């Protein structure tokens, strides 16, 4: 999965890393996942029509970024100096469990690349280079370069994330990560390379929160793909049974469902058909 870097991080844009640290795993057992997260991730990913409904909002952005005409899931940032620029997603969430993928090439992140959630009131532009998402009480963000969590960052220090990091350590991320927003529990979490990193923020209940990022790198392009969502109602017994069967088979053997001695209608159900 991602890699750990030791030493202080300087506020400079580095196009080519001088050293590629050895890959390493999480310390200890994976933190407990939110209820029903495995169920959500086991479901087929949302189709393009749903992804477009949950895409970046071309009407809710800094003027220095734009949603691409040929790829409505991706925004592009103009190379404007001394400016931090953000964009919100179209859909805000007040209930349910939701997951979306952020694809942000590591070489396009620069000194302040922040991913998180925000209310409709959070600012989307700031003069200078800063961790804009998480800078006030209206947003919650993970600075991908510094491996720090920010909320009300003008008044509160950042917190190391994942939690196993030391005070002078950072976590080098791959190009993609998953954001997990559980509005029923009021938590925000992240998944990297299939590893759940634990709860980043709590206390989000009662709000309506939108996907958001803020960027400083000129010509960076960031893509958001909504994975899926689950309403807060308890899952039906049939869904729980399907999840149990698919878990018993494992991802590598799901293709064997078609050869099981079961009625075709049940095979179809197990394959979300």
From Swiss-Prot:
Superkingdom of the organism of origin: Eukaryota
PROSITE patterns the record matches: B302_SPRY, SOCS
Domain B30.2/SPRY: 34-233
One matching Pfam family: SOCS_box
Metabolic or biological pathway: Protein modification; protein ubiquitination
Keywords: Biological rhythms, Cytoplasm, Ubl conjugation pathway
Location in the cell: Cytoplasm; Cytoplasm, Cytosol
Region span, Disordered: 1-34
Cited Gene3D superfamilies: 2.60.120.920, SOCS box
Ranges of residues in domain SOCS box: 234-273
GO CC terms of this entry: cytosol; SCF ubiquitin ligase complex
One GO BP: protein ubiquitination
Keyword Cytoplasm tagged: yes
Family per record: Belongs to the SPSB family.
PANTHER family membership: SPRY DOMAIN CONTAINING SOCS BOX PROTEIN (PTHR12245), SPRY DOMAIN-CONTAINING SOCS BOX PROTEIN 4 (PTHR12245:SF3)
Quaternary state and interactors: Component of the probable ECS(SPSB4) E3 ubiquitin-protein ligase complex which contains CUL5, RNF7/RBX2, Elongin BC complex and SPSB4. Interacts with CUL5; RNF7; ELOB and ELOC. Interacts with MET. Interacts (via B30.2/SPRY domain) with PAWR; this interaction occurs in association with the Elongin BC complex. Interacts with NOS2. Interacts with EPHB2.
Listed name of the protein: SPRY domain-containing SOCS box protein 4
The organism of origin for this protein: Homo sapiens
